[in-house]
């Protein structure tokens, strides 16, 4: 018997079956860096339309986690896909380097020494700490295969960035939008600083819930009542009732607010008179333990205005005032009002001339003037206030409640509302709120669409933007304060001159902290209010959200890689209240336009059960763990596979599925590359019109799937890319087309039309696969590209620079429907053969002959194709459906067809393994006529 294996055109490629990603990926990263792959990708589109994805800066603190890894991979997919689509998309990564978390870490390392060190030294240590983690995270992001300008990222602590941030503040000052005043803001007693809305997280918290009575010995109460009722009221035993979950604010009470239109019940209980909302009376009575009560009258809240109650602890007045925000959802309908500790309280205080009283230090400790509670922090004061109220007889009831309460994003401790002198950007100044809302509706595409309503509601209801922080590590608020009268000097011309110095200074805005007041104050400057000349520098720094929110000015407008406005901002959905929000206000406030055209958000990464990752639960999966076990490619594939616009799950099981999918895609690439050996497109390519029918159809099929994938990239539907690519490789290629043409590729003459026709489709398929894979499976696409025969590559030195000119088949819908029907027929034939294989009657489908009893439509569809090749059998006979034998299989899912499967007749060809008549060629007695003809040339 002759060895005919050598006469077959078997696949030949050095592209390995085993990926060995953990070893190969670092080698490829090194090669990318040495050969400048990122630059080559961008240069390929040097003259093309620019696409700007502006990177939201991650915080330079700690290692990357799954959320930041997913974010960076998503951005990388977009940048690479846009470049491969012919746009010039450059990626400038950035880092947020200022702020409390870094300062906290430095303080922890310094311990008690921090009090002895000047601000300049603390800032130097913060700068070094941030720089260290920029380097750590940069290596971790690069390990994910993310391409970008890693050597020149933007850092919010660079002098040019700090200057740009300060300049934007100057622009707001120039427009008159910056206000300095005393207002209640979120305050963290542990961090000793104001907090922005975006720095507050709401968590479940248990608080004391107390009902308190305020003595109301005022004749005005009697005037509000009918005469017959007034005569029964003993003012010395009359009270207005309030409810609060913050007992510590009772010492700072300045008023009691009622709704002008609500009805209030004047209720007698054991000789005492209580005033509270009529609708809430039954619930309150139960809480107070009243077994019986008598409503003497009801009175509109408006009639109680001006009555003066007495503070429940101190000898101080608490007037009754009107407020529309009072509700009947809970409490008593009478609201304890402390203008120093609540936004609505503050507004009510302004309207009614109440003192904004908040006698505590930055740690939330009551000052000496606060009788009974001096020296206690607010949380220590809670039980003491309750004790005092009980002692003086004004505590009606107390209990514990669990509710959603604001906590500091950094230290995770509960925060308070506290009125302090702060700097604000006024939301009504220059119509900032109105302009921002219009921009949200008219000028930005929000993906998912619900993002629009979310940010619209936030901007619509937000207070003025508190931009000051009482810390060291950040950009200073450039202003001088008169020591004699507290007047502010922030003339824009002077502000911009200081900004210019920041830009020149080696350490940027350290200039402000290093220079003495004499070096900074303009010569001869006198206070315009009092004429004094004693000035001090403003100590506060800018909110880090203002820092990062002005990145459009520092980066998008300034760097050659970008242009304003950016095409896309992409971050987690929490950034509707964070970076998207601050960037919008900063841009609209100075330029009247938003900084972005499209805003795309992703969800959080959770575990397999949908739980948030937490060290305490022990369910944290770090990116490095996945890379060490599977390689970055598998993590990248996972990012593409999930619907990232929602919260996404990750687990070992999910990653195992990714590994299986990856293996199938890799094997498909390897098979195609192996069968392209010896193929030169310039001399061997077959025009679509000259191809074999199935090749023509396959080319059309792959083209259509390629278009689906490219459209999905354009629409940010990466899970659609993943599923289409997976289906193409496993079903439409491996299980269908590649399976069918294997015989022809191996057995036909090396240069025959049959083989070259199939190879042309494989060449085109590989080009499309590379373009479709590269944004996601970047390492594998580059590896596969490096193993392509040189004559197929063109001038591109990297897969990210390929711009393939694809052959376009011309197939009409009728022909497509014909092939879809044929694919269905083939599926049913495969099913019919399977029982024989399972029962070991046959070893391979080539051991069979099939008879198809077909209706007219199916019979016609089967005309003009090489049927034995199509069904991978040794014989095919077509007969009318009416002649179907009893032993024929009748498919349930395809009408008009019956299939009879039997063992093939003839002898098995030693070369192609088909059963046929052998020995027609005396030189090759073991071969079928087809194989003998191939060898005869």
From Swiss-Prot:
Database matches in Pfam families: Anticodon_1, tRNA-synt_1, zf-FPG_IleRS
Binding-site positions, ATP: 615
CDD domains: Anticodon_Ia_Ile_BEm, IleRS_core
EC number: 6.1.1.5
Cofactors: Zn(2+)
Binding site for Zn(2+): 909, 912, 928, 931
Annotated residues for binding of L-isoleucyl-5'-AMP: 571
Span of the annotated motif 'HIGH' region: 58-68
Entry GO MF terms: aminoacyl-tRNA deacylase activity; ATP binding; isoleucine-tRNA ligase activity; tRNA binding; zinc ion binding
Biological processes, Gene Ontology terms: isoleucyl-tRNA aminoacylation
Major subcellular site: cytoplasm
Keywords for the protein's UniProt record, in alphabetical order: Aminoacyl-tRNA synthetase, ATP-binding, Cytoplasm, Ligase, Metal-binding, Nucleotide-binding, Protein biosynthesis, Zinc
Motif 'KMSKS' region, residue numbers: 612-616
Function: Catalyzes the attachment of isoleucine to tRNA(Ile). As IleRS can inadvertently accommodate and process structurally similar amino acids such as valine, to avoid such errors it has two additional distinct tRNA(Ile)-dependent editing activities. One activity is designated as 'pretransfer' editing and involves the hydrolysis of activated Val-AMP. The other activity is designated 'posttransfer' editing and involves deacylation of mischarged Val-tRNA(Ile).
Summary of subunit composition and partner proteins: Monomer.
NCBIfam families: ileS (TIGR00392)
Entry domain remark: IleRS has two distinct active sites: one for aminoacylation and one for editing. The misactivated valine is translocated from the active site to the editing site, which sterically excludes the correctly activated isoleucine. The single editing site contains two valyl binding pockets, one specific for each substrate (Val-AMP or Val-tRNA(Ile)).
Assigned protein family: Belongs to the class-I aminoacyl-tRNA synthetase family. IleS type 1 subfamily.
Protein name listed in UniProt: Isoleucine--tRNA ligase
Organism of this sequence: Maridesulfovibrio salexigens (strain ATCC 14822 / DSM 2638 / NCIMB 8403 / VKM B-1763)
